[in-house]
Amino acid sequence: MIPTFYQTHLKKQLTSAQFLVMTTLLSVMQSEKQVRLERLARVFPYPITTESRRRKLQIFLDLPNLTISLIWFPLITYWLTTYCRIGTRLSIAIDRSQWGCINLFMVSLICPRRAIPLYWSLLPKLENSNFESQTTNLDQVLPLFSEYKVIVLGDREFCSVDLGNWLKEKGVSFCLRLKKNLCIETEHLVWQRLDELGIVPGTSLYLQGKKVRKTLPTTGFEVACKWKRNYGKYQVKEAWFILTDLGSLRAALNAYKQRMGIEEMFRDCKTGGYDFEGTSLKGNRLVNMILLMTLAYSSAIFQGNELKKKQVQEYVSRRTEQKKNIADGLHLVLD
């Protein structure tokens, strides 16, 4: 089931035949939880041969108007204006996923315990993203959030001080996890690696007004340091070192914790859900297939939130039964 505002927008961008294929394909994707073209062609409800259905879907994926800017961005804008007040603080996570010969850069909007893809692109080489690719992808989505307070979250691949400076110039807050071998100036002309600051499990530290990066040092940043406490068998291997401008340790840690939503999103879209790593599509067809998957995935999230607001989720989801004691069951049988 596709939300009404999705259908209204898609009808404006597609012909009647294209809209019918789109909505049918989204319904199939939601029911099958698959984006593999062969699987979709096999179950697509159209009275032609499987090979003809596969070819029909390939032609659909090649449509020139099937783009992120035309199909997806207006839906994001509608959702923001409808459900988010102007000035609301929103978190955007950046990440990269690689499988086979595919290197995918993803920008996502953090939702409660999940994330929704905003923009994605295929990197030309199988390597970490660089400053240019990071800023190019962020430039695509930041204009959508001009009326909101944005925090960009990134793991250690995105620990570039240059990226922090670029975000600061854009008026965007950030929490970028640093590598432990980065140096900061603790005293005048005294530089220390982050892992030499004496942070141990159960301790934290917040550094302000320190120079960061021994080569081409930069000022104006803050570094939040936190090593979670060990509990029994639960051992935390290393500390968090986060480059930020949020002003306090608590704010930085609470913001960065939200980045885990993009990990859950990738799990839902990979082996735990739509299995987009299993598709053999490449290039523009893969980008457009991820667009369709995003429409199916996000519509399910939006509808789930609406059901929660109506407090009817207990009637449409599987009830979790409590584990019964075997002895109690045996007692009932004997009686």
Segments and roles (model prediction):
Residues 54-114:
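Active-site-proximal, Lys/Arg-enriched surface segment
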